[in-house]
Amino acid sequence: MASQKRSSFRHGSKMASASTTDHARHGSPRHRDSGLLDSLGRFFGGDRHVPRRGFGKDIHAARASHVGSIPQRSQHGRPGDDNPVVHFFKNIVSPRTPPPMQAKGRGLSLTRFSWGGEGHKPGYGSGKFYEHKSAHKGHKGSYHEGQGTLSKIFKLGGSGSRPGSRSGSPVARR
């Protein structure tokens, strides 16, 4: 076991990664596994520049951090929740799911409350929008400022990525 672990430190944690590190050392073109490693690094926020150098120890260090983070996520959710997007949305929709011990005591009332909370979430969201609209209507003295900011928001609606360049023009006109 110890000799296998030492060889894994030199070549990476998997057989496929060992072949890609050897190819990277000899300068041959990269294969799918190295691209997958780069995309995993980008997804988990790891160092993108470390695996590109092609050193076995660096790739193992980056791979170890990814391998360490994947089982934690899969243990946290159900076995079918390996998709991070599904995991993210399930946490948003029902963030207050009770632990199984609490659910046994008063399961019906808790499930009713959780469904009620999910049903009322769009209502709360629309209520916030109504509050914002009523706040703009309440400031009748600064009616033109409110219109200016609303027109800026509607003009920005298309781009959204460059707020600095577009938002400067309505201010200059005023």
From Swiss-Prot:
Database matches in PANTHER family: MYELIN BASIC PROTEIN
Post-translational modification Citrulline, affected residues: R25, R42, R166
Keyword Acetylation found: yes
Modified residues (N-acetylalanine): A2
List of residues that carry Deamidated glutamine: Q4, Q72, Q102, Q147
Positions of post-translational Deamidated asparagine modification: N91
Subunit structure: Homodimer.
Record protein name field: Myelin basic protein
Gene (name only): MBP
Bias kind Basic and acidic residues: ranges: 22-35, 45-61
Disordered: annotated span: 1-86, 126-174
Top-level taxonomic group: Eukaryota
